[in-house]
């Protein structure tokens, strides 16, 4: 199924007679895929939380609110108003960077869920789809290549620095951050897609 959807990305770019329709098709696939990942992230986080004691949930949530995610190093809109003012290319570039930041951490999600739900391959396919959208929306700008998005801040290897004795906290934060970032990407891609319809109301 993943290969079929990715093929649709490629075939859609090859049709030049209806550029708006093609872009909408590309965006529809990308939005659908990130919605699936967001729902999956929510389910995994909820399942993990339900396995904890109430006091554990409270303490972990308190720590998480004071901590940060790996992706916080990536410059992104601070609120819905800035999101709506951002260009399509900027939203696509940030979305790519957010998905890319999970290439390594996604392999360590709780309970072997990454392998069971094929999360890493799904992220990789979404990255390739977003890359195609970036190329299609550059309009003569420098081509996007080698997985590098300009004007985005670097990020650290935060998840690699946690010790084994912090495995519970690590699992909680990984799932919470994964859920948060998939929500961000879903929002950015949805707004970017909406921009292709001049008469649409893209208010968040």
UniProtKB/Swiss-Prot annotation:
Gene: gh
Organism: Trichopodus trichopterus (Three spot gourami)
Pyrrolidone carboxylic acid sites (modified residues): 18
Signal sequence segment: 1-17
Domain of life: Eukaryota
Gene Ontology annotations of biological process type: animal organ development; growth hormone receptor signaling pathway; positive regulation of growth; positive regulation of receptor signaling pathway via JAK-STAT; response to nutrient levels
Protein name: Somatotropin
InterPro entries assigned: 4_helix_cytokine-like_core, Somatotropin, Somatotropin/Prolactin, Somatotropin_CS
UniProt main location, coarse: secreted
Keywords recorded for this protein, A-Z: Disulfide bond, Hormone, Metal-binding, Pyrrolidone carboxylic acid, Secreted, Signal, Zinc
